[in-house]
């Protein structure tokens, strides 16, 4: 009798433990599922805001910068040429962002070809943007340092050559590591270029830390020159306006790309401490909403540049007004010509001559 009672008690205790364990598991699962759903909804809302508010500005604005400047090719100054190339890089990223911003569940990273292709596009744009901004800061320093004399470095021919070299450097900075990594991971079906630990270090170093060190040095030298030139204030108004626009563009770039690089750096430091976590998607899978927000911040930079360029660039505003007037006058002329033709041309008779 005692043995039966003991066995019944044991069965009851065991069943209770199993029920408690099952309840705790189900509760944990429901909480995690609820958190994922909440993150998904917030991410979807932010993606919709980006698509409605920022994407049209970035896409149409960068195209407008290209069309207006190319329409006034003869009046294009050296800073305008750099901004045109920056607009091309931004347009590539804005077009790519429409796919990336709705990658809420990171499903695109499961397809190696799509993951690699999008990563290559993103890196080429990122490198070209930061390289152009770095070179523009250096160009502004050269312009101010040699304000009293013409510098052989600041000619349109050298500017075009510089743009070509910057694009080549951006492509090489992306394709050379890609080629090396591809040979190391040959035969791996599910290998993605974006998941390589060393590539992430290269992106943070070459694409952020080194360029901003150079930019900081250039602007500290520019500040020193401007402080010394107070007695020649009449010579600086136009230069200060151009300088102000470039400073704002660089600051916006820094603010937009800093969260992305901090996020990647935390991930890299985790991988350094624990080699088993050396994958680019670990932190993004653990904190998908944070990863999505820093992505949106980075993409927003390419949408904000046209606004900065149109509001702070007086030369561009003048070109835009002239461009609109030309288009409006051409439309008036076309309507006048069509109206004149309708009045003076005889109406064709429907009766055929015999």
UniProtKB/Swiss-Prot annotation:
GO cellular component, one term: nucleus
MF annotations from Gene Ontology: G protein-coupled receptor activity; nuclear estrogen receptor activity; steroid binding; steroid hormone binding
Biological processes, Gene Ontology terms: adenylate cyclase-activating G protein-coupled receptor signaling pathway; apoptotic process; cell differentiation; cellular response to estradiol stimulus; cellular response to gonadotropin stimulus; negative regulation of meiotic cell cycle; negative regulation of oocyte maturation; nervous system development
Chief place of localization: nucleus
Tissues and organs where the protein is expressed, per its UniProt entry: Expressed in oocytes (at protein level). Highly expressed in brain, heart, testis and ovary. Weakly expressed in muscle and intestine.
Pfam families associated with the record: 7tm_1 (PF00001)
Record carries keyword Mitochondrion: yes
UniProt family annotation: Belongs to the G-protein coupled receptor 1 family.
Cystine crosslinks: 115-192
Designated name of the protein: G-protein coupled estrogen receptor 1
Cellular localisation: Nucleus; Cytoplasm, Perinuclear region; Cytoplasm; Cytoplasm, Cytoskeleton
Functional summary from the UniProt entry: Membrane G-protein coupled estrogen receptor that binds to 17-beta-estradiol (E2) with high affinity, leading to rapid and transient activation of numerous intracellular signaling pathways. Plays a role in the embryonic development of sensory and motor neurons. May induce apoptosis and reduce proliferation of brain cells. Involved in maintenance of meiotic arrest in oocytes.
Gene: gper1
Keyword annotations from UniProtKB, A to Z: Apoptosis, Cell cycle, Cell membrane, Cell projection, Cytoplasm, Cytoplasmic vesicle, Cytoskeleton, Developmental protein, Differentiation, Disulfide bond, Endoplasmic reticulum, Endosome, G-protein coupled receptor, Golgi apparatus, Membrane, Mitochondrion, Neurogenesis, Nucleus, Postsynaptic cell membrane, Receptor, Synapse, Transducer, Transmembrane, Transmembrane helix
SUPFAM superfamilies: Family A G protein-coupled receptor-like (SSF81321)
Extracellular side: 1-40, 103-112, 182-202, 267-292
Oligomeric form and interacting partners: Homodimer. Heterodimer.
Record topology, Cytoplasmic segments: 62-81, 134-160, 224-245, 314-353
Membrane topology: Multi-pass membrane protein
Bilayer-spanning residue ranges: 41-61, 82-102, 113-133, 161-181, 203-223, 246-266, 293-313
């Amino acid at each position: 009798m005692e043995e039966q009672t003991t066995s019944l008690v044991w069965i009851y205790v065991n069943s209770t433990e199993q029920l408690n364990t099952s309840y705790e598991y189900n509760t944990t699962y429901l909480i995690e599922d609820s958190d994922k759903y909440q993150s998904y909804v917030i991410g979807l809302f932010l993606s919709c805001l980006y698509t409605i508010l920022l994407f049209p500005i970035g896409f149409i604005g960068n195209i407008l910068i290209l069309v207006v400047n190319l329409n006034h090719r003869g009046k294009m100054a050296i800073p305008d040429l750099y901004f045109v190339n920056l607009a091309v890089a931004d347009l590539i990223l804005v077009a790519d962002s429409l796919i990336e911003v709705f990658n809420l569940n990171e499903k695109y990273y499961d397809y190696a070809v799509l993951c690699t292709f999008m990563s290559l596009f993103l890196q080429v744009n990122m490198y070209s943007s930061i390289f152009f901004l770095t070179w523009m800061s250096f160009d502004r320093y050269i312009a101010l340092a040699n304000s009293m004399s013409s510098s052989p470095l600041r000619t349109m021919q050298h500017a075009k050559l510089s743009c070509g070299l910057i694009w080549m450097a951006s492509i090489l900075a992306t394709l050379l590591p890609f080629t090396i990594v591809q040979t190391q991971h040959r035969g791996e079906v599910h290998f993605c270029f974006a998941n390589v630990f060393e590539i992430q270090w290269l992106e943070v170093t070459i694409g952020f830390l080194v360029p901003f060190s150079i930019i900081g040095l250039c602007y500290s030298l520019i500040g020193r020159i401007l402080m010394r030139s107070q007695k020649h204030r009449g010579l600086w108004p136009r230069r200060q306006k151009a300088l102000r626009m470039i400073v704002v563009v660089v600051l916006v770039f820094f603010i937009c790309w800093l969260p992305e690089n901090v996020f990647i750096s935390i991930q890299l430091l985790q991988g350094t401490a624990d080699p088993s976590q050396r994958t680019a998607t670990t932190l993004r899978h653990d904190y998908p909403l944070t990863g999505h927000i820093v992505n949106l911040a980075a993409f927003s930079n390419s949408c904000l540049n046209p606004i900065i360029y149109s509001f702070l660039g007086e030369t561009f505003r003048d070109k835009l007004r002239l461009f609109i007037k030309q288009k409006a006058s051409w439309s008036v002329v076309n309507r006048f010509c069509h109206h004149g033709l309708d009045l003076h041309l005889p109406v064709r008779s429907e009766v055929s001559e015999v």
